[in-house]
Amino acid sequence: MKKLEDLILTYKDFPKKGIEFKDVLEILQYPDIFQDIILKMSSNQFLKKAEAIISIDARGFIFGSAVALESSKPMIVARKPGKLPGQLLTREYDLEYGKNSLSIQVNALKKFNSFVIVDDLLATGGTVKSVSRLIRDQKKKILGLITVVELKSLKGKSKLDFPVHSIVTL
């Protein structure tokens, strides 16, 4: 049986020179491993206390949807520019390789007060921090982050002021 760490592929110089991109999509080709990851993510203690999940564009949707289904929690999406209709909350953030922004629909947040963020990977923490600020600006709570992979060398966890649970740390 394959090990999870073996399914996280590295692409050098992607999306630009000097970046080592960690790709989790290989996991989806192994349903038994994917299911095990989802069960582990769904059994997290701070998820049990959350009213809803927020997943981050785009690979976060894969894991967030499955965790939402397994845990019977509603899911809200944080999307990149130009992808959501309606009234939006938007925040810019820094990446290892540039800047971007994320938006969440205002109406989606009105229904809930406490959230867990689900994403595929924690690197520098910029994306997750951006989402957490969007939520907190609305006087809502972030109970934690659940992610498949944490890249320890990039120290993203140290930039967050809420619990982080990663299935694997590289």
From Swiss-Prot:
Entry similarity comment: Belongs to the purine/pyrimidine phosphoribosyltransferase family.
Cell compartments where the protein resides: Cytoplasm
Role this protein plays: Catalyzes a salvage reaction resulting in the formation of AMP, that is energically less costly than de novo synthesis.
Name assigned to this protein: Adenine phosphoribosyltransferase
Source domain of life: Bacteria
GO molecular function, one term: AMP binding
Alphabetical GO biological process terms: adenine salvage; AMP salvage; purine ribonucleoside salvage
Quaternary structure (record): Homodimer.
Classification via NCBIfam families: PRK02304.1-5 (NF002636)
InterPro entries, alphabetized: Ade_phspho_trans, PRibTrfase_dom, PRTase-like, UPRTase/APRTase
Annotated gene: apt
Species: Prochlorococcus marinus (strain AS9601)
Location (main, coarse): cytoplasm
